[in-house]
Structures are given as C-alpha cells and as structure tokens.
Amino acid sequence: MTLLKRYHIYGERSSGTNFLDHSIKDNFDAINVFADDVKDVDDIIERCRKYGHKHWFGDDLDLSDTDDILFLCIVRDPIDWLRSIYRTPRNLYEPMVESQERFLFGKYASTAVFYDEKVSFKLGGYEYCNNIFEVRHIKLEWICEKLPKLVKNYMLIRYEDLKNDFQGTMKKIKDMGLIKKNDISEDIVKMKKWMKRDDLDDPIATFDFAQKDPKVKLQPTYYRPNYKPFNFSIEDYPKEFLHYEKVLGYLR
C-alpha cells in the first residue's frame, strides 16, 4: 500500500465537507491540496482549475498526475440535506427560498464564489439546473461513477457513517493509505462541538424563537437562517432522481 500525504474532498454544501476536513486534520499528517498553504489568488485559481472546489467539480477538471492524492467524497441523506440547505441557503439566489415549493421545484441557481477566465463558470460556483434534485443527481453521478475512473485513490463516505461510526470511518481512511497521527480522536462530541452548521444546540436558532421575536423574521441569506418549517419526505422525491439515493442506501 502506498502511503499518502495529500487529499482532496468533494461534496455538496451542508453534506459534512468541513466536518470531514476538520477530522482529517486532527487525525492525519496530510495536506488538503486545494485549501492548505495557498500563496495568492493565482494559486487558488490554478488549484480550482486542476482539482476543483470542494463544492463545485465535474468534467472540466484536470485530474492527471494525481496518483499521490486521496480523493474523498462525502454524501448526506437527501432529506436531511435538503432541510439543511433550505435552513441555511449558502450561495443560492435568495428567491429560491421564498417558499418550500419554489425551493424544491423551481429553477436552481447558485451564485459565484469567484470568477476568472481560466476557470469555467461551473467551477467558479455558477450552477443552473431545472431544480435542486437535478443538481444533486448530476453531482452524485460524477461522484459515484465518473470520478472513480479518473483517479487512483478514491473513497466515498456517508455523512451518517462519519457521525455515527467515527472510529470506523477514520480507520477506513487510514486503510486507504493516508498517514495518521499517533492517536485517532475517540471523542465524537468533541469533534462535532465546533460545527454549528445546523444550529441544533442553539436555542435562538429555532422556528419557535422566530415566532416569538419578529426582529429575526428576515429573508434568509448566507448569514441568516430560514425559520420556515420544512415538510418533505423521501416518498415525495421525484422518481427520476432516485437512482443514486438507492445506490447510496438512502431508500428505506
């Protein structure tokens, strides 16, 4: 087995990419090839063109000469993911969350993180699809089918497994060749304590609180949560986009 000291992560927003990256940094002597030791803007642009951003990736990448890199992909239960995205719509156009119906079945549009002529619109953060199910389906297809054929070292992780079997997941990453530190953290509570992505332990970040305090009833943005209730189940999921949810074990 070849020992690896470099890695890259792919996954949608609110799928656990930060949690996974933080866990790797705590437990392995490895460098994130996209995010670590960035020199300047030109360096970021070149890395984006070569490897892709963790959230924006696809066929436009140049993944040649990457045999010394472990590519980790993380996915999350579709309903939990939709609820989290609806709650905190990072980099989505604000009209998308005017209502649950608009969010689920209206046109999907993602705002750009940056733009440069050397990088395609898609890799810079621009995304346009018929709906949010379609964009997830396209990304899952690339993660599950295309990426494994492009790189030597590939691993797919479910957010639920990272959360519920942290030790087991870290061991699987070690078995892929990433060089571990002396001890792997056993305290999952400590590992998740810093991550307030869903604000589940914050009493003011709840729908009930929003009803009590009209000052926080604002249109949700990147920084402001959406307090509207979200009622949607896998039974309502469009059938044409269920294939990869079944492959990933999310159809019960």
Regions found by a protein language model. Give the residues of each.
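PAPS-dependent sulfotransferase catalytic domain
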Residues: 1-107, 111, 128-155, 250
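Phosphate-binding beta-loop-alpha motif at adenosine-nucleotide cofactor sites
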Residues: 150-176
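A short, charged helix-loop
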Residues: 106-124
